[in-house]
């Protein structure tokens, strides 16, 4: 049954995506199906989101990271237990919001906007979730690589740098 659903999802993705893309699917040792999709036209994320919605799916989370001189987003989407991972490179640091299509993307889009300074086009509620308005968007990426932040080794130092920068901007 999941195999049939996977084939329908893949067919619909191929039908709706307008730009170039790479697509592969795999099944792990426990039988979990994953679809991996790399979009070369960032606008196609809207078509993918519509496919997910049409199949009754949701946005689980969106990962953001820095690659060379630009950001990359990986959308982790779910349709009835089938995980669809969609990679989009942002060479202009801008992406269309999928929240108007998939409300489940709301907070995770706002989080990457705030933490990485990625510009969201068309988000219905782009207010911040965590950082005070006086702190610049994307500031965390300027002071500390994610790998250091994740191990918690330098949290105090990071916040000291952010507070110092904020106080400089106030004067």
Predicted feature residues:
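Terminal low-complexity/charged segments
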Residues: 1-171
């Amino acid at each position: 049954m999941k195999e049939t659903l996977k084939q329908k999802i893949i067919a619909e993705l191929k039908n709706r995506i307008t730009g170039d893309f790479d697509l592969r699917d795999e099944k792990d040792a426990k039988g979990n199906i994953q679809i991996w999709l790399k979009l070369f036209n960032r606008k196609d994320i809207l078509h993918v989101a519509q496919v997910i919605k049409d199949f009754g799916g949701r946005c689980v989370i969106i990962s953001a990271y820095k690659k060379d001189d630009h950001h990359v987003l990986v959308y982790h989407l779910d349709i009835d237990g089938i995980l669809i991972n969609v990679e989009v490179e942002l060479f202009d640091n801008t992406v269309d919001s999928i929240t108007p299509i998939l409300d489940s993307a709301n907070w995770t889009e706002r989080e990457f906007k705030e933490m990485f300074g990625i510009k969201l086009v068309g988000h219905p509620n782009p207010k911040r979730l965590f950082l005070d308005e006086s702190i610049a968007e994307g500031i965390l990426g300027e002071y500390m690589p994610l790998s250091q932040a994740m191990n918690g080794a330098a949290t105090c130092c990071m916040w000291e740098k952010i507070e110092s920068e904020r106080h400089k901007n106030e004067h």
